[in-house]
């Protein structure tokens, strides 16, 4: 092999080795999922972007055919995220009727600003919980947190869709 070709082969191997990232851990994967559904735009819009600039009146608007409003969807996310977080932390949970409709229908536009603030706080608490959890706790909680993130992404998409129907969505925020 010619010296130049050998040097190029060694150099490319060294460059590839430097670009190699450490393998993902359960903690890093869960944090990535939490961040992308909370406040870091990636393949889809996170909740903080989906509700940004939405007024209480806009949050209460319901599309035809009985679909949920953006406010009802955000309230539902707050309810389930808070409830599961309380369970993971070993805290007592608020009373639940067992009727999932209640997790949407108890929304009141007067509480819109509080719903947005509390949802942001709950998402931050999840992130802190995952950052400080033991490996054993993460192994136990991983599937539940992953499911919560999937649930969040699903309803965030609905919020964006409702806003598009309403005409209150700014496509510059990530979804054209």
Can you say where each PLM-predicted feature lies in the sequence?
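Short, contiguous alpha-helical
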Residues: 23, 32-44, 48-51, 58-101, ...
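A structural signal for well-ordered alpha-helical scaffolds and beta->alpha junctions
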Residues: 27, 40, 44, 81, ...
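Hydrophobic h-region of N-terminal signal peptides that target proteins for export
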Residues: 9-17
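Amphipathic, well-packed alpha-helical segments that form the structural scaffold of globular domains
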Residues: 48, 52-56, 124-127, 131
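Cleaved targeting-peptide boundary
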Residues: 18-26
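Active-site rim elements
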Residues: 30-37, 109-113
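Acidic/histidine-rich alpha-helical segments that form the ligand environment
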Residues: 103-136, 143-146
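Sec-dependent signal peptide recognition
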Residues: 1-7
